[in-house]
Amino acid sequence: MGPLALPAWLQPRYRKNAYLFIYYLIQFCGHSWIFTNMTVRFFSFGKDSMVDTFYAIGLVMRLCQSVSLLELLHIYVGIESNHLLPRFLQLTERIIILFVVITSQEEVQEKYVVCVLFVFWNLLDMVRYTYSMLSVIGISYAVLTWLSQTLWMPIYPLCVLAEAFAIYQSLPYFESFGTYSTKLPFDLSIYFPYVLKIYLMMLFIGMYFTYSHLYSERRDILGIFPIKKKKM
C-alpha cells in the first residue's frame, strides 16, 4: 500500500496559509483598534486628544510594530512573497521613529506630528492587511486591490515628511538631554543629533527606492503595461 495522503488541514501549504491569515488578522485588528480609538477620541475631545495620542494608544502601536518585524522572517524563509530590502526599509523607518525618536523623548510624544503619523501608518496598514488577509484565502475584490496598490502613493510621501518633521522636532531635546550620546575612549564621542541628521538625509534616499519598488509592484499587480505596437 502506498503512503496515505495527509488531510488538507495538515498539509504544509494549508498550515502556511492558516498562519499568515491569523497573523494578518491580528495585525488588522490591532491597527483597526488604534484608528477607531483615535477617531472616537478626536470627536469626543477635539484637538486635546491629539496631545495625548501616544499615552492612549502608544503601547498597542509599539506592540503592532514590533510584531511586524516577523514579516522580514516571513520573506526570508519564503512563506511570504515579497522583496526583503524594500520591506526592511519600511519597517526600520517606523521602528526608528517610534522607538528611538518618539518613545525616548517624552516632550516629543505630545507633539501633533505623532497623531498625524499614527493616522497615516494605520490607514495604510488597515488596507494592506485586509488585502493580504483575503488574498491568502483566495478572495479578491477589484476595488480593494486597486485601493491597496494606490492609497500609498499620496500617503507614503506624507509619512516620510511627517517622520522627518518628528526628527526635526526631537533634535533640541536630544541636544539638551544627551540621550544616546556616548563618550568613547581616545577623545572620541558619538553625538546622537548628528546621527539623526545623517539619518534624515538617508530617509529621503530610502523613500525614493521604496517608492520606485512599490510603483513597480503596483504596475505588475494591476496589469498596467505599456502598449506595444504589433508588427505588420
Swiss-Prot record:
Keyword Transcription regulation: no
Pathways per UniProt: Lipid metabolism; fatty acid biosynthesis
Classification via InterPro entries: Tyr_Pase-like_PTPLA
GO biological process, alphabetically ordered: fatty acid elongation; sphingolipid biosynthetic process; very long-chain fatty acid biosynthetic process
Location of the protein in the cell: Endoplasmic reticulum membrane
Residues on Lumenal side: 41-56, 134-135, 179-189
Keywords: Endoplasmic reticulum, Fatty acid biosynthesis, Fatty acid metabolism, Lipid biosynthesis, Lipid metabolism, Lyase, Membrane, Transmembrane, Transmembrane helix
EC code: 4.2.1.134
Topological region Cytoplasmic: 1-19, 78-112, 157, 211-232
Tissue specificity statement from the Swiss-Prot or TrEMBL entry: Highly expressed in leukocytes, and low expression in heart, spleen, kidney, and placenta.
Reaction catalyzed: a very-long-chain (3R)-3-hydroxyacyl-CoA = a very-long-chain (2E)-enoyl-CoA + H2O; (3R)-hydroxyhexadecanoyl-CoA = (2E)-hexadecenoyl-CoA + H2O
Top-tier EC class: lyase
Entry's Gene Ontology molecular function annotations: 3-hydroxyacyl-CoA dehydratase activity; enzyme binding; very-long-chain (3R)-3-hydroxyacyl-CoA dehydratase activity
Statement: the UniProt record of this protein carries the keyword Zinc: no
Annotated Pfam families: PTPLA
GO CC list: endoplasmic reticulum; endoplasmic reticulum membrane
Membrane topology: Multi-pass membrane protein
Residues of the active site: Y156, E163
Predominant cellular place of this UniProt entry's protein: endoplasmic reticulum
Membrane-spanning parts: 20-40, 57-77, 113-133, 136-156, 158-178, 190-210
Homology family: Belongs to the very long-chain fatty acids dehydratase HACD family.
Subunit structure as annotated in this protein's UniProt entry: May interact with enzymes of the ELO family (including ELOVL1); with those enzymes that mediate condensation, the first of the four steps of the reaction cycle responsible for fatty acids elongation, may be part of a larger fatty acids elongase complex.
Function (record text): Catalyzes the third of the four reactions of the long-chain fatty acids elongation cycle. This endoplasmic reticulum-bound enzymatic process, allows the addition of two carbons to the chain of long- and very long-chain fatty acids/VLCFAs per cycle. This enzyme catalyzes the dehydration of the 3-hydroxyacyl-CoA intermediate into trans-2,3-enoyl-CoA, within each cycle of fatty acid elongation. Thereby, it participates in the production of VLCFAs of different chain lengths that are involved in multiple biological processes as precursors of membrane lipids and lipid mediators.
Protein name: Very-long-chain (3R)-3-hydroxyacyl-CoA dehydratase 4
Organism in which the protein naturally occurs: Homo sapiens
